[in-house]
A protein has these predicted regions:
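Condensing-enzyme catalytic core mediating Claisen C-C bond formation in acyl metabolism
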Residues: 1-51, 154-226, 230, 234, ...
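Solvent-exposed alpha-helices and their adjacent loops that cap or buttress functional pockets
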Residues: 1-2, 73, 102-104, 130-133, ...
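Short beta-strand segments
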Residues: 10, 83, 113, 138-144, ...
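Short acidic, glycine/serine/threonine-rich loops at helix termini
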Residues: 20-21, 91-93, 150-154, 322-326
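Acidic-glycine-rich active-site phosphate/pyrophosphate-binding loop
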Residues: 30-39, 89-103, 140-146, 201-209, ...
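Claisen-condensing/thiolase-fold acyl-transfer catalytic domains that form or cleave C-C bonds
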Residues: 56, 60-63, 67, 86-87, ...
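Short glycine-rich phosphate-binding loop at a beta-alpha junction
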Residues: 75-83, 248-256
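Flexible, glycine-rich active-site loops centered on histidine and acidic residues
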Residues: 131-165
């Protein structure tokens, strides 16, 4: 059996819709305040997709700059993975919509549903498919239009979420670089603390479900907070060990941008200096599967990661799911 190659990120991209919804705007919609939102979440603004935009549209707009950075065309992509909790349709997959809109004539396509951990899962899956020699260039995208899945009369959730997409192209890299280790976990017994109750065959959408608000995101905030901090901290330490490095070696740490208090709690647990982590939840809100990809593209384009840096991505989301990817940057 031939030795596996190394695989990593060749290019990144992101897209955020033009419309921005501020905390001041939300003050006019629900019983809340800018101070209350900022002190509890760190969020100041979030982007909202137009009614004409679909999740696959956001995916395409994030994918194009990623392809350009990688020096590739749609014809070079032989597999597409879209991580989303807000697909265009239940069937067909959003990834198939992206394949068509981008013109990736030779690509297979699939969606993965891992909540806010979706981008972490996609990086791990795509990298290992390339390592195994099954594909040469895989386009991964985390994308969400959560503004259509929140109850805009529920101040506990509508203040949190935003829309956007983050993309990356995964391919072969120099030995010793790219994905060094990953860890993916789940606990379905806690799925009920973060879900959309009426959204499938177990509980179909009915008039009663609509009237009772069960078609919208439901979240038990305190329980989600505790689980997020616990699992993201643990999965990060586990993956660092598997990669053969320590937390002191981390050059850039990007956690799922759910809530600034969660991010700071994880950073404190790992004793990370502020200049080794990145936070943009203040500008985007929680974009679920898109958040890590958006943040990664911003740090790459700002020149905050360089050749040889150790980059750590970690996430937590509905499922419950969690995961971590440790990479050495090309």
């Amino acid at each position: 059996m031939s030795e596996l190659c190394s695989a990593g990120i060749l290019g990144t991209g992101h897209y955020a819709p033009e419309k921005i919804l501020s905390n001041a705007d939300l003050e006019k919609m629900v019983d809340t305040s800018d101070e209350w939102i900022r002190t509890r979440t760190g969020i100041e603004t979030r982007h909202i997709a137009s009614r004409s935009e679909t999740t696959s549209d956001l995916c395409v707009k994030a994918a194009l700059p990623a392809l350009e950075m990688a020096g590739l065309t749609p014809d070079d992509i032989d597999y597409i993975i879209v991580a989303t909790a807000s697909p265009d349709y239940v069937v067909p997959s959003t990834a198939c919509m992206v394949q068509d809109k981008l013109g990736c004539k030779h690509a297979g396509a699939m969606d993965i549903s891992a909540g806010c951990s979706g981008y972490i899962y996609a990086v791990a899956l795509a990298s290992n498919l390339v390592k195994a020699g099954m594909y040469k260039h895989i386009l991964i995208i985390g994308a969400e239009i959560l503004s259509r899945l929140v109850n805009w009369q529920d101040r506990s959730t509508c203040i949190l979420f935003g829309d956007g997409a983050g993309a990356a192209v995964i391919g072969k890299v120099e030995d010793g670089y790219g994905l060094l280790a990953s860890d993916l976990g789940s606990d379905g017994s806690l799925g009920k603390i973060l879900n959309i109750p009426a959204s499938g065959v177990a509980e179909p959408v009915t008039h009663r479900a609509i009237d009772s608000g069960r078609i919208y995101i439901h979240m038990e905030g305190p329980e989600v907070f505790k689980a997020a901090v616990r699992h993201m901290g643990a999965t990060t330490l586990k993956t660092l060990k598997a990669a053969g490095i320590t937390k002191e070696d981390i050059n850039m740490f990007i956690a799922h941008q759910a809530n600034n208090r969660i991010i700071q709690a994880i950073a404190k647990r790992l004793a990370l200096p502020e200049d080794h982590m990145y936070v943009n939840v203040n500008r985007y809100g929680n974009t679920s599967a898109a958040s890590v990809g958006i943040a990664l593209d911003e740090v790459v384009r700002a020149g905050r990661v360089k050749h040889g840096d150790y980059v750590v991505l970690t996430g937590f989301g509905a499922g419950l799911t969690w995961g971590c990817d440790v990479m050495r940057w090309m």
